Amino acid sequence: MCGIVGLFLKDASLEPKLGELLSAMMITMSDRGPDSAGIALYGNKQPNLLKLTLQSPTPDQDFDGLDHLVSERTGSEVTMERRDTHGVLFVTSELLLEVRRALGDLRPSIRLMSTGESIEIYKEVGHPAGVVNRFQLEKMAGTHGIGHTRMATESIVNTLGAHPFSTGIDQCLVHNGSLSN
């Protein structure tokens, strides 16, 4: 059993409240999936930049100074915003492959959750209300988002098993049930 929520805002005046609206939806859906949760938010585009949303099992160790290390490695300015176990690196599209290689060399335990101009994927193990609070979802803005509450039935409960899954640049997937059926 899992729960899926989604919201596409047609009224731009509501964009600052997207996180607040999705938070309430995720918490309401908690009984459908209490072991892990995730959210994909679309918004906060930066001109000429891509966002790489990263996850780390040891964020204090992995994220401390990461933007400076990647900047030194690439010779270009890279900035980062951190949210609990996740961080968003802002890079130019020309640097994407170089930055991904640098991340593998510098911090091999970091996992790439999503890449795109608009998407940010946040997901973790725990009750959906706790996941929403950890990432301060209620403070996030955007144009649309999709969330998933999970109760694992055929696989282990871990961060990588939580949804959404990145399927390409600015794309993600959530599903309810076994894809093998």
Give residue spans per PLM region.
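N-terminal segments that mediate ammonia production and transfer
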Residues: 1-181
